Amino acid sequence: MESFEGQGDSRQSPDNERGDNVQTTGEHDQDPGPGPPSSGASERLVPEESYSRDQQPWGQSRGDENRGWMQRIRRRRRRRAALSGHLLDTEDNVPPWLPPHDITPYTARNIRDAACRAVKQSHLQALSNLILDSGLDTQHILCFVMAARQRLQDIRRGPLVAEGGVGWRHWLLTSPSQSWPMGYRTATLRTLTPVPNRVGADSIMLTATFGCQNAARTLNTFSATVWTPPHAGPREQERYAREAEVRFLRGKWQRRYRRIYDLIELCGSLHHIWQNLLQTEENLLDFVRFMGVMSSCNNPAVNYWFHKTIGNFKPYYPWNAPPNENPYHARRGIKEHVIQNAFRKAQIQGLSMLATGGEPRGDATSETSSDEDTGRQGSDVELESSDDELPYIDPNMEPVQQRPVMFVSRVPAKKPRKLPWPTPKTHPVKRTNVKTSDRSDKAEAQSTPERPGPSEQSSVTVEPAHPTPVEMPMVILHQPPPVPKPVPVKPTPPPSRRRRGACVVYDDDVIEVIDVETTEDSSSVSQPNKPHRKHQDGFQRSGRRQKRAAPPTVSPSDTGPPAVGPPAAGPPAAGPPAAGPPAAGPPAAGPPAAGPRILAPLSAGPPAAGPHIVTPPSARPRIMAPPVVRMFMRERQLPQSTGRKPQCFWEMRAGREITQMQQEPSSHLQSATQPTTPRPSWAPSVCALSVMDAGKAQPIESSHLSSMSPTQPISHEEQPRYEDPDAPLDLSLHPDVAAQPAPQAPYQGYQEPPAPQAPYQGYQEPPPPQAPYQGYQEPPAHGLQSSSYPGYAGPWTPRSQHPCYRHPWAPWSQDPVHGHTQGPWDPRAPHLPPQWDGSAGHGQDQVSQFPHLQSETGPPRLQLSLVPLVSSSAPSWSSPQPRAPIRPIPTRFPPPPMPLQDSMAVGCDSSGTACPSMPFASDYSQGAFTPLDINATTPKRPRVEESSHGPARCSQATAEAQEILSDNSEISVFPKDAKQTDYDASTESELD
């Protein structure tokens, strides 16, 4: 493809460039045809001639090259001049050859909109589905749409039989995806562009895209050849951005200037446009103005476009005729000074003139008015009609189209989703105006139909669908008996409030009247005191959940004013004794104990305040709701202890059972008849938690398995955890936990680990170490001063707080070992035995796992986790200055006398051995830092990735250097690996 610089301009290009003189070579006569990518024209043009040239001696061939070079330059110039025609006489001037079809490079937007319009046609549905559903980019959309167009053309004109007898190509295709309505596959092929007589054919890449619809995935499908634009590199993207900016500016210009822009882009020859393509004098003056704007324009994008298009960086003005020739505008009757004035005015006005039109026209009509040219010359019809063949169709020139119907993102109006729980929408409830002693009764009485008021026990029982054999008192709302007798009732409807989650609470779960033996003043079942429940209940945090925590239970005294209202039940602990902890109003009434749950006194806090409730034997636990519902309901009827708020459901449940057992120790005989909830079979094993406060919690003594005392402050988060996530796995050895008593037995067969000793009073010799995991460090004695023994480097923090070791379950080894260790992220990290140095005995080089046990003689090794993160500074608080590198790096040189804390010092190779990385062993620091050992044995050279650092130094270069240096008499022994530095040519021994 001939770029705008002209491929022939570079001396490196082969002699016959692809666009230049292809007519003379007969290689293009047969079509490369289908199949594997054949070597295109560019490979077959050059070889014979270049081989013959290579046989000649160098000087002669170079002279030929120069001569051929100038010949080619002249031929190129001649060809360009012949195309543009401005060097020939004006009589036999022939317009340049143009392709026979309209040059209309569609923008990608036009094609995409066409694809969207193709949705309406049934036979193109699959293609548009593929384009629009799979989120493709514009390039793929272009490929698919052109594939469809090519396929339709093939079908319309039948099998195309070329000269070589090549018909349609077809492939067997399978879809890569199991879920698309239309699979596709592509294959690529390099061919030549179809130009007449194959003159100037470009070698291009064709991509055949095959589609198959609706799971018919193995079909013979005919290919459609699709031109895939090559992926643009950064320079091309820059160029595209410039061109796009120019097109955007062009869209703002007036139509006459847009037309001149299009003519220049189409022809590329200013002379040709000036002499052949401008009909009227006004058009000629417009062209002059356009040239004036271009000559003074400082917009880089427009400059780039203009010079690229005319192929020249010094624009020539076609009205400046050669001196022996009558200029064209004079023959058209335009005076020279008119042209000069128009040119200078446009130069002064600049780019803005193209949009506003400037004064010469006199009217500032908008660019869309099509009578701009025809209003002044009515005869100029062919100019207007030529607007259809403009080479670029800008979206601004066309009527605004609606967004394709595909992209309307509105969800289709279908039936609302069937929710798995009853909602006021799915199960409308009859509304009644029941007076409840609720603080929200006003809001509920005036509630809209979307949020209906409290539901009475109506006969419309749609849900719950599960069988509800209920034995529970019938609650008649208006004239209730003072003590209602338990009569079986029909299941009550779902609550009328709108439920916003899966937490279903039915009214019949809550409305339940209990036989009460008590004084008359509290014989009326009153409401849960919602204002005070707010302070107590750890669960109902938000007002909305609190409001729907327990639907209003109907008290027998609802016809009159409530017997004990919210004011009567005082603050949580300071009410009358009959008003107990206000979890449920006066404890005599208790909160309505929800059916399958405990009918035990729910209001019975740790002090047994108020009379004791005896549940009638007739009130057996109902099988009311599925277990999930029970789980969520139990949340709402937990006892309100005066201690710390329980923070998770299992704590609350366990606390309720504890208080139950504490309060009535004699009720164990009665508990067979008492309907305490059987522990559901679906209860997870989370309730077997060890309840150990991280502070000063005592292990809890309780007879129940899952019990947690709500009176003890338990500082755990709300979700149950199996251990303190900050602690390492071995709780008995962790220094933070060692001072605490043994935790509560977490499961039943649990043997208690041996209790650790009290913290060290002085330094004791530790027993022979049995490390629980590799590299575990025992905490040093607390009695010692911080530098009392060598290598001690300050108190240990819990390792989970160290920023490098956030993962306590798979820790690093604590000591820097040689070789590759799995990081803490690897779940399969093997727990290796402690690895030592290469030194033979347990001498001074042994990397000690216990820093306080180190021999005084050995150089103290810094523990890795004690080194601060800025590794370039040695830790200032370690008593002896370390005389070794931070991590022992196996290099081919002996360890230097001073620590090499160079930022480039350590690199880990993916092969597993820690070896000096490229910069360390390279020319930057080789001479500067490393003391060379000339007589050292030379190990194998470290692998160097060629990709990351550019091409690695090739071994032959090293070999050459070695030969050169071994010939040198100065250096008799030279290590194989050592390279000369780039910055001075001195050898390593001189640097030493």
Swiss-Prot record:
Residues 445-461, 659-676, 700-714, 845-857 have a biased composition (Polar residues). Sequence repeats lie at residues 551-555, 556-560, 561-565, 566-570, 571-575, 576-580, 581-585, 586-590, 591-595, 596-600, 601-605, 606-610, 741-753, 754-766, 767-779. Residues 1-70, 355-905, 931-954, 967-992 are annotated as: Disordered. InterPro entries: EBNA-3/4/6. It comes from Epstein-Barr virus (strain B95-8) (HHV-4). Residues 130-159 are annotated as: Interaction with host PIM1. This is Epstein-Barr nuclear antigen 6. Belongs to the herpesviridae EBNA-6 family. Keywords: G1/S host cell cycle checkpoint dysregulation by virus, Host nucleus, Host-virus interaction, Modulation of host cell apoptosis by virus, Modulation of host cell cycle by virus, Repeat, Transcription, Transcription regulation, Viral latency, Viral latency initiation and maintenance. GO terms for cellular component: host cell nuclear matrix. Residues 12-31, 715-724 have a biased composition (Basic and acidic residues). Residues 741-779 are annotated as: 3 X 13 AA tandem repeats of P-[AP]-P-Q-A-P-Y-Q-G-Y-Q-E-P. It is found in: Host nucleus; Host nucleus matrix. Pfam families: EBV-NA3 (PF05009). It comes from the Viruses. GO terms for biological process: symbiont-mediated perturbation of host apoptosis; symbiont-mediated perturbation of host cell cycle G1/S transition checkpoint; viral latency. Plays an essential role for the activation and immortalization of human B-cells. Represses transcription of viral promoters TP1 and Cp through interaction with host RBPJ, and inhibits EBNA2-mediated activation of these promoters. Targets host chromatin through interactions with host transcription factors, especially RBPJ and IRF4. Alternatively, EBNA6 also regulates the transcription of the EBV oncogene LMP1 in a cell cycle-dependent manner. Coiled coil: none annotated. Residues 381-391, 506-520 have a biased composition (Acidic residues). Residues 551-610 are annotated as: 12 X 5 AA approximate tandem repeats of P-P-A-A-G. Residues 595-611, 738-764, 772-781, 859-881 have a biased composition (Low complexity). Residues 479-495, 563-594, 882-899 have a biased composition (Pro residues). Interacts with host CTPB1; this interaction leads to gene repression, but also seems to interfere with the repressive function of CtBP pre-bound to DNA, leading to EBNA6 mediated up-regulation of many host genes. Interacts with host MYC; this interaction enhances MYC stability. Interacts (via N-terminus) with host RBPJ. Interacts (via N-terminus) with host histone H2AX; this interaction facilitates H2AX proteasomal degradation. Interacts with host TP73; this interaction inhibits TP73-mediated apoptotic pathway.
